[in-house]
Regions:
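Conserved core of the sugar-phosphate nucleotidyltransferase
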Residues: 89-210
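Left-handed beta-helix
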Residues: 172-264
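A conserved hydrophobic position in a structured secondary element of the catalytic/binding core
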Residues: 28, 80, 147, 170, ...
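Conserved beta-strand segments of alpha/beta enzyme cores
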Residues: 47, 139, 228-230
Length: 264
């Protein structure tokens, strides 16, 4: 973004007031571990979890949560992708604190809903139901797949639909219990893997067992099945930068419709 920092560095920066560096965890492909070490030199090396093969987000998140739970059984966790842009970091941190306060005292899952600024067809949507008294948090009525243009326009006009940012907040017991309930095979693999966490055998065990996990997203594995799911609608200048097209919408364009980032 022309600021001299990578997206993962910006992600860590905006969470820094909420979390000490020793409590950051990064799950990534084995082939990117050296890049993570270079980008985040203050991150403890043991907090970089290397997937031997990509199995989608449910096994990825389960691996991190089972490992965190073994050392921090009362952990309150935020799961976030690192390829998003957030403009208003102060508001982002306020929203995260509210979500963490809620999950610290409730056996519930909170997903951050972004108030839509346009009828976007590239994101999934969260349909909110009733508001929880005394909070900014709403019960989730349904998760919606990426819509066509007309449906997206209806969602925006309705006012109770929000973009699914893929940012989840939960207590470690809440998510491990949910995975155990809805995807018991995945939980069984994590239980077996966890016996060797923090030992010399961990890498070999993960290499052997992780590829046997079903390839499934956390949305299908848990979010669309669990009952205690809530959303916290937010406006902090969020954009998913998973494609060049989404990046282009954030950049000024010249008279030819071209966008340029100057990197010195």
């Amino acid at each position: 973004m022309g600021c001299g920092k990578s997206l993962i560095q910006l992600t860590v920066d905006r969470f820094a007031p909420l979390c000490p560096m020793e409590n950051f965890w990064v799950v990534t492909s084995e082939k990117y571990t050296d890049i993570i070490k270079e980008q985040l030199p203050d991150l403890p090396e043991c907090n970089i979890l290397a997937e031997p093969t990509a199995r989608n987000t449910a096994p990825c998140i389960a691996y991190a949560c089972w490992k965190i739970k073994k050392q921090h059984p009362q952990a309150n966790i935020v799961v976030t992708p690192s390829d998003a842009l957030v403009i208003n970091t102060g508001e982002f941190q306020r929203v995260m604190r509210n979500a963490l306060d809620f999950t610290a005292t409730n056996c519930s899952i909170v997903t951050i809903g972004i108030k839509p600024s346009r009828p976007e067809t590239g994101y999934g949507y969260i349909q909110a139901a009733e508001q929880i008294n005394g909070t900014e948090i709403y019960k989730v009525d349904a998760f919606k797949e990426k819509p066509d243009v007309e449906t997206a326009k209806e969602y925006v006009a309705h006012g109770s639909y929000f973009w699914n940012a893929g940012i989840f907040v939960w207590n470690v017991d809440t998510i491990t219990d949910a995975i155990r309930k809805f995807t018991p095979d995945l939980a069984a693999i994590m239980d077996e893997m966890s016996r060797d966490f923090y030992t010399a055998q961990e890498a070999d065990t993960v290499e052997r067992l992780f590829p046997t996990c079903e390839k499934i997203s956390i949305d299908y594995a848990v979010m669309e099945k669990a009952e205690s799911i809530y959303t916290l609608p937010a406006e902090f200048g969020w954009s998913d930068l998973g494609s060049w097209g989404s990046l282009r919408t954030l950049l000024p364009q010249d008279e030819h419709g071209l966008s340029i980032i100057h990197i010195s």
